[in-house]
Amino acid sequence: MYAIIETGGKQYWVKPGQNLQVERLNAEVGANVEVKVLWANDAEGTSADAKAGTDSAKVTAQVVRHLRGKKIIIFKKRPKKGYERTQGHRQDLSEIKITDIKIG
């Protein structure tokens, strides 16, 4: 049983019990959230496709923790002009655990 979900503008292939890091969710740690399902399939071969209009699939996930991603450095320089700018960025993330995939 697996599903393709969308959260934070990205798509993920998931199965029950899997942990993954997604863009920060507006939910407390330990809270259950329902994630948008694009496509799902179960062991019997039954599938649900959101684009075909069969919105019968639901994926439930639990927020494990909130964290920040790896730091990236942005450096700009103009040769021979003495122009240098450095900026850093760390993305806010949430780690979720897929608890259940239901079709129908």
Curated annotation (Swiss-Prot):
InterPro entries: bL21-like, bL21-like_sf, Ribosomal_bL21, Ribosomal_bL21_CS. This protein binds to 23S rRNA in the presence of protein L20. Part of the 50S ribosomal subunit. Contacts protein L20. The keyword RNA-binding applies. Keywords: Ribonucleoprotein, Ribosomal protein, RNA-binding, rRNA-binding. One of its GO terms (molecular function) is structural constituent of ribosome. Belongs to the bacterial ribosomal protein bL21 family. GO terms for cellular component: cytoplasm; ribonucleoprotein complex; ribosome. It comes from Elusimicrobium minutum (strain Pei191). GO terms for biological process: translation. HAMAP family: Ribosomal_bL21 (MF_01363). The keyword NAD does not apply. This is Large ribosomal subunit protein bL21.
